[in-house]
Structure formats: C-alpha cells, structure tokens
C-alpha cells in the first residue's frame, strides 16, 4: 500500500475537514435496541452457568433420620490410641494416620478413597445417659464434635489458664483463651473490673437486679422500726399509730438535730391486758424527754368542744381512754409529740396525731385512782393537793401524782410522768386554785402564782404568755399559767432540785438525753 493511498483512506480531505472523524450511522432505532439486547445477553450468560449449590450440613443435634447411629463408650471416645499399629503397638487417633504409619514398616497400606456413590452418614451418641445428646434424635454428626462435647460437658478440665485460673477440658479451647486473656477488661457501672467476660455478665445480672430492687424498695424508713396497729391493742415503743400516721424517714432527715433517744434509763413493757401499756422507769430519774420542735408542746392535748381556744393554745399529754378510741392521722397539731387523749365520758373521741411524729406514751398504771368517784368536794381536792405538795418536796417525780378525779363536766387527762394522773376540770379556775395551793405548800407560795405561771428564761423573744412548755432538759423551756389569768406573784422553789419558778432544775447526772 502506497503512502498516498494510506493518507487518502485515513486522513480525510480538506474539503471534508468540517465533518467529524467518527461517523455514526443514522439508522433507525431498531439497530439501537438490537445492540442493547446483545449487550444484556452477554452480561447474563455467565450467571446461567453457575455451579450447583452445595449440600448443607445438618445442624448439630438434628441429624439425618437415615444416618447410622453410633454409640461409643466413654473409654473408646476418650482414647488417644484408638488405632494400634501391629508392629510397634503405637496408637493413633485416626485410621488414616495408622495407614500412613504402616508405610514406614513396608506394610501394605490403603487410604480411604472418595466414592462416587452416596456414603451413608454416621451420627454419634453421647455416652452420658443424662445428656440431651444421648437421644438418637439429638445425636452429633461427627466424631470430633462428640469428643469435644464429652470433654467439655462431662470430662475433666485438665488445662488451666495461668492468668485467670480458668480451666478447660479441651486443649484447643485453652489455647484460644490464652491468646486473649488479659488483653481486654470489662468494667461494670459500679466500678468493678473483670478480665473475663463470663464473670462480667454474671456480675451484671446481680448488679442490675440489685439496682432494680433498690429502686423499688429504697432505704428502710423509720416506719419499719415502728410498731403500728389500728384501734386499741399493744403497740410499739413509740405508741399506737392509726392508719396513715406511720413515721417516715423523711422526717428524720428534715430534723437531724433533735437527738431523740427514748430508751435511756427506761424499760417499756407492753401489756395487752386492759388495752393499756406500762411505762416503768428503771430509776428515780423523772426526766423524760417530751419537747416540742416549736417549743410549744410539752403537754399536748386534743381540743374538745368546751375549751377549743384553750386547747389550740396549749398542749397537754394525751393518753388513750380505757375504752376504745378512734385514732386518726392529722397534721393540725404542731407539737413534737402528740400523745393520745383520754376522756372518761367520751367513747369515740378523736385524737389528732402530729405531722412530725405520732405516738402516745401510755404510762398507764393500775392504781385505784381510775375508778374514783366523779363528785369530789373542794376540801378533798385541797387535801389531795396538800399531799401532792408534801410528796413532791421529797420526790420530784411525784410532781404530777394524785388529783384522781374531777366533776361531771371535767375532761380527764392522764399525765404519767411519775405514774399518777392529773384530772383537769373544765372550770380552769378550780385547777388554778389547786395549783396555787400546791405551790404554796411546796415552797412558800405567793399571792397568785402558779407552778404553771412561768416565763421563758433563755428565749428572750418568747414570753410566758405565749407558750406552755415545761422543759425537762433544762434549756430554758417554761410552762405558763394554764388559765392565762393567774397573777405573777411570788414563786417558791421545791426541795429535791425542782424549782417552782418554771425552770425544772435537776442534777447534771440526771439528764439522760444530754443538755440541749
């Protein structure tokens, strides 16, 4: 081929330089569709010649129903020299290894050849009768698998990890563990670190259960330590509590500094007979802590119908009546301890339990004063007050002992600081006169002073006309006049460490709860 002809055939002439170098045919759209079909057939052709899918193995424990079931003894299954050489008695685990060994002895040997025909498969039973794989329907499909299963589940764990002391029955498991042991740690939310995943999972199960249990049952509240019962009957050391009036541990957290310890020096004996309980002091110490959180409730009463205003301003110790009374929880009374009210002629009087603590220190004693006559003359009452004064001079604990009865319209209030009871008449003038007489007998009485007509000594912002508090701790709590009408006459002091000026002064060693 000449150069001119090459140039003519390859390089277009100058006259046709405006035409493109590659000239596409301007045929119809049928040619384009034919090309697409040819291209798609070329792509799909290799897939059409894909090899047939492989036969899947049966899952462990689900053998082929047509398989041959082989049951080997534990000795045979765990034997390391199952196949023995006839020449040197050397054992081998597999028959193929024995055949290869026979070549060294110039003995005829034969390896298993793959057969073109279908070979009947074998399944192996676990020799342990209690194992699930002892059932032919749960047999394992290969000899190695049944061996490892028997070693892991029923055999001795001979291989031990030096790092975590975990033991393995199969050497391959031990080697695999040794490669990763100590390289990864598992940290629980509680801060405990584990090197083993199984230990971590076990710990998390207990830790999560503990967290859930703590969320459902928080810290044991003070209620669980308080014996509560409905109506009458024996109760705990903190008194008989009505429904809904149980103590809560939140109250303790709100008032951390009150330091209440009622068990020092006292023995609380609960008697179920006669629906009452006995409070027996272990010593002659009369100091029992009954102090209001607001300095207003040494003697806390529930108001009755006749002297509502008086009861709202003062507090007297309240005890249960001889008959059943209905205790109901209430937060209207703001005393630290609100003690059960006890009326002889009212069978269903309701006691207002406090919002802070609910208790009625039932210091009931079986004396003859309970059944005394309701009509007592003024002379008898005066004689009783005189006796109280003489006894109080020698024993401060008998300060509130006596005064066993009142008139028909009186409301009975049992105050058991020394074991006796005070019967307060609704006519406050009678009680005022009795208290004045007692003060006169006890320490050279004044013109109108009462043992309850006192003032606050340490608290300058509180006057005697505002509060009625007898503080047995000696921190300045006072008791003011019951009637709010008693004069401020001279106040005497009793013997035995009791002062009638309103401050109960006792020897230092007689403070079982410490000085406030």
UniProtKB/Swiss-Prot annotation:
What subunit structure does UniProt give? Binds to RGA and SCL3 competitively in the nucleus.
One GO biological process term is:
asymmetric cell division
Q: Region SHR-binding: list its residue ranges.
A: 196-208
Record-linked InterPro entries:
C2CH-3rd_BIRD-IDD, C2CH-4th_BIRD-IDD, C2H2-2nd_BIRD-IDD, IDD1-16, Znf_C2H2_sf, Znf_C2H2_type
Organism, scientific name: Arabidopsis thaliana (Mouse-ear cress)
Task: Give the keywords, sorted.
Answer: Activator, Chloroplast, DNA-binding, Metal-binding, Nucleus, Phosphoprotein, Plastid, Repeat, Transcription, Transcription regulation, Transit peptide, Zinc, Zinc-finger
User: Superkingdom of this entry's organism?
Assistant: Eukaryota
Zinc finger (CCHC-type) locations? 186-209
Q: Where are the C2H2-type Zn fingers located?
A: 83-105, 124-154, 159-182
Return the Low complexity bias intervals: 1-26
Organelle targeting peptide span: 1-70
| The protein's name | Protein indeterminate-domain 4, chloroplastic
Residues that the record marks as modified (Phosphoserine) are 73
Tell me which GO cellular component terms the UniProt record holds. chloroplast; nucleus
Skewed-composition ranges (Gly residues): 484-495
Question: Which amino acid positions bind Zn(2+) 1, per UniProt?
Answer: 161, 164, 177, 181
Function of the protein: Transcription factor that may act a transcriptional activator of nuclear-encoded photosynthetic gene expression. Binds DNA via its zinc fingers. Recognizes and binds to SCL3 promoter sequence 5'-AGACAA-3' to promote its expression when in complex with RGA.
The record lists Zn(2+) 2 as bound by 188, 190, 203, 207
Q: Name one Pfam family in it.
A: C2H2-2nd_BIRD-IDD
The induction annotation reads:
Down-regulated by gibberellin.
Gene name of the record = IDD4
């Amino acid at each position: 081929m000449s150069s001119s002809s090459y140039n003519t055939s390859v390089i277009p002439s100058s006259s046709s330089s405006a035409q493109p170098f590659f000239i596409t045919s301007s045929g119809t759209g049928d040619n384009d569709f034919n090309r697409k079909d040819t291209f798609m057939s070329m792509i799909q052709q290799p897939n059409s010649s894909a090899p047939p899918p492989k036969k899947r193995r049966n899952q462990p424990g689900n053998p082929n129903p047509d398989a041959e079931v082989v049951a080997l003894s534990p000795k045979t299954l765990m034997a390391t020299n199952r196949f023995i050489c006839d020449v040197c008695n050397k054992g081998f685990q597999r028959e193929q290894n024995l055949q290869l060994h026979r070549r060294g002895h110039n003995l005829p040997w034969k390896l298993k050849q793959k057969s073109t025909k279908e070979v009947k498969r074998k399944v192996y039973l676990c020799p342990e009768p209690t194992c699930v794989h002892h059932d032919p329907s749960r047999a394992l499909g290969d000899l190695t698998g049944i061996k490892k299963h028997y070693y892991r589940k029923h055999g001795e764990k001979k291989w031990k990890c030096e790092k975590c002391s975990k033991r393995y029955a199969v050497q391959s498991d031990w080697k695999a563990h040794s490669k990763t042991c100590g390289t990864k740690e598992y940290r629980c939310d509680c801060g405990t670190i584990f090197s083993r995943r199984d230990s971590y999972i076990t710990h998390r199960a207990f830790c999560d259960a503990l967290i859930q249990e703590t969320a459902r049952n928080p810290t044991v509240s003070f209620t669980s330590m308080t014996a509560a019962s409905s109506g009458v009957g024996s109760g705990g050391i903190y008194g008989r509590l009505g429904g809904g009036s149980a103590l809560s541990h939140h109250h303790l957290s709100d008032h951390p500094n009150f330091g209440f310890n009622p068990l020092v020096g006292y023995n609380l004996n609960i008697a179920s007979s006669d629906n009452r309980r006995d409070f027996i002091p272990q010593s002659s110490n009369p100091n029992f802590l009954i102090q209001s959180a607001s300095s207003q409730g040494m003697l806390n009463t529930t108001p009755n119908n006749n002297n509502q205003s008086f009861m709202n301003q003062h507090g007297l110790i309240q005890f249960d009546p001889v008959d059943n009374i209905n205790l109901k929880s209430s937060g209207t009374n703001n005393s630290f301890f609100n003690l059960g009210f006890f009326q002889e002629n009212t069978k269903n009087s309701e006691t207002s339990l406090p919002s802070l603590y609910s208790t009625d220190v039932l210091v009931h004693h079986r004396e003859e004063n309970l059944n005394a006559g309701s009509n007592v003359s003024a002379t008898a009452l005066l004689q009783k007050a005189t006796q109280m004064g003489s006894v109080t001079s020698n024993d401060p604990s008998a300060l509130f002992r006596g005064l066993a009865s009142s008139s028909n319209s009186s409301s009975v209030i049992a105050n058991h600081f020394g074991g006796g009871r005070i019967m307060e008449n609704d006519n406050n003038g009678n009680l005022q006169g009795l208290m004045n007489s007692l003060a006169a007998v006890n320490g050279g009485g004044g013109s109108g002073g009462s043992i309850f007509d006192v003032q606050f000594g340490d608290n300058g912002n509180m006057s005697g006309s505002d509060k009625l508090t007898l503080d047995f701790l000696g921190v300045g709590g006072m008791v003011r006049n019951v009637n709010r009408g008693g004069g401020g006459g001279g106040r005497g002091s009793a013997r035995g460490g009791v002062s009638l000026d309103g401050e109960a002064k006792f020897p230092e060693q007689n403070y079982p709860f410490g000085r406030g």
